[in-house]
């Protein structure tokens, strides 16, 4: 009798494992059918804050410029890549040096070379990055946006370039009234991914009002009043 119960329990576990594997494979196949796009961000978490729902529902390679030498941040980033079925590349250019935000003067050309290498590695459907304002003005966001834009303008590929959406501060969030929000389902899925960035809880709290919005803008429409 005991052997029979034990056998039934083992079979149930096996079936659950098979179903789980089939679900993962099915999700991966769906992602693989989407045209492949490239997202380029300054820090681990930027890809999720400004484009998490796109990652979940699309087929992306994400190039992150900083924190590849930070074990915690790198692990969080790679966990997000796994969760969203994305390919992640995380470099180790400086985020902060001696407690202060690095100005990238010493590594500007190296960063540009790495960005160009990834841009030229495939014929991407879209190349997505920080907007020229750096969202809320972060200097690294602005620099990444500038480098990506400069390369794509030089290569005459700006038709592929897409920027993260406009930012509004908490006190000015009324500016977002006419912006389209993510569906409840997509927003919930995005929040589930956000949880993987436990080290960035303060950042997520500060930018929480922006999480329901991912209204990206093509290069050709940036700055136009709609």
Regions inferred by a protein language model and the residue ranges of each:
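N-terminal Sec-pathway targeting helices
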Residues: 12-14
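Cleavable N-terminal signal peptides
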Residues: 20, 29-30
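Active-site rim/loop-helix segments in enzyme catalytic domains that contact anionic ligands
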Residues: 30-122, 149-158
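Short, Lys/Arg-enriched N-terminal segments with co-localized hydrophobic residues
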Residues: 1-10
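General helical structural elements
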Residues: 16-17, 77
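Bacterial N-terminal signal peptides
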Residues: 17-24
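Metal-dependent de-N-acetylase/amidase catalytic core
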Residues: 32-37, 58, 107-226
């Amino acid at each position: 009798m005991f052997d029979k119960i034990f056998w039934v329990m083992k079979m149930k576990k096996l079936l659950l494992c098979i179903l789980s594997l089939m679900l993962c494979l099915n999700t991966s196949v769906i992602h693989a059918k989407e045209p492949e796009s490239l997202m380029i961000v300054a820090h681990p978490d930027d890809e999720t804050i400004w484009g998490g729902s796109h990652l979940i529902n699309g087929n992306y390679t994400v190039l992150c410029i900083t924190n590849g030498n930070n074990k915690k941040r790198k692990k969080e980033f790679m966990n997000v890549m796994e969760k969203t079925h994305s390919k992640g590349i995380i470099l180790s250019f400086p985020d902060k040096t001696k407690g202060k935000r690095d100005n990238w003067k010493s590594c500007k050309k190296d960063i540009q070379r790495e960005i160009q290498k990834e841009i030229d590695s495939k014929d991407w459907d879209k190349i997505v990055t920080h907007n020229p304002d750096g969202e809320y003005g972060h200097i690294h966001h602005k620099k990444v946006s500038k480098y990506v834009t400069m390369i794509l303008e030089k290569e005459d590929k700006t038709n592929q370039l897409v920027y993260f959406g406009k930012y509004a501060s908490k006190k000015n969030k009324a500016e977002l009234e006419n912006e389209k929000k993510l569906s409840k389902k997509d927003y919930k899925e995005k929040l589930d991914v956000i949880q993987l960035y436990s080290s960035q809880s303060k950042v997520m709290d500060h930018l929480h009002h922006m999480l329901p919005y991912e209204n990206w803008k093509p290069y050709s429409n940036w700055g136009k009043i709609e």
